[in-house]
Amino acid sequence: MKTQLNILLGGLGLFALQGCKAPQAEQSVQPNVIYVFPDQYRNQAMEFWGQEGFREKVNFRNDPVHTPRLNDFARESVVLTSAMSNCPLSSPHRGSLLTGMYPNKSGIPLNCNSSRPISSLREDAVCVSDVFCNAGYDCAYFGKLHADFPTPNDPERPGQYVEDRVPAWDAYTPKERRHGFNYWYSYGTFDEHKNPHYWDTEGRRHDPREWSPLHESGKVVSYLKNEGNVRDPKKPFFIMVGMNPPHSPYRSLDDCMEEDFNLYKNQPLDSLLVRPNADSKMLKAESARYYFASVTGVDRAFGQILDALKELGLDKNTIVAVSYTHLTLPTNS
């Protein structure tokens, strides 16, 4: 019997773990590992918290969102309700996630932003990806990194920034700063969700004009299928997927998929904003529809990765984790 282990780290307070443990003698095959972590995803925005077996375990009311794939994932898991981020801020959290260090040690005490003091992942730090690489894994990173300070190192325009002006957030990560990730499809930070861009392993830029979580899940599926011989099929793999949504903005259909927005567009705001201190009359209250639509879209993108694992027969020997950098308050952002 092979071991299957699923992990779900939700917001600042959920840790789910599933698997039937095989006898030690049967665990000779190294498991694959996939770690998916959307940005700015609130703990309450998971539908299963309102379902039997879960709602009794928490002291909050869940948001009225549709997350069918996370619901199923949680049902197959042991859910812990008190996991938390030591630093629920984008870049510092990522530094701690990668290195296991507190932000004052990882090199990233602040969000990586060119208008602030330099904050950037230490090149000499041993990251989790370095450990996997040294253990014989093929390592791949997809999506938002936000762990490097913007510098003039555009691979296609040496000596220039990745934008025509000094970017506030976005940055290119060269090979020597990738910490064991031998497959790369990533960017620093860029918040146009339907107009994303990525740099690949060789530093080529791609502008796919596709909602970023669905594009990234498609690239992960391609990697799993080993299209283009991008990984060694004899090696186990370690994958990290840094989805940007449901990070702001959440103002219009430029920020989410219309099919997901349609699930919420006709619902009264009073029924969407269920926290007792929420003010549905605020101008920004309308953002809840777009935020929840992004949550549902991220759920769908995550489901595509799970479907590919099952289709390829990789699901029984793959550890899957879902985590979030930090929560958000849609009407306050």
Region spans (language model):
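Formylglycine-dependent sulfatase
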Residues: 4-13, 20-327, 333
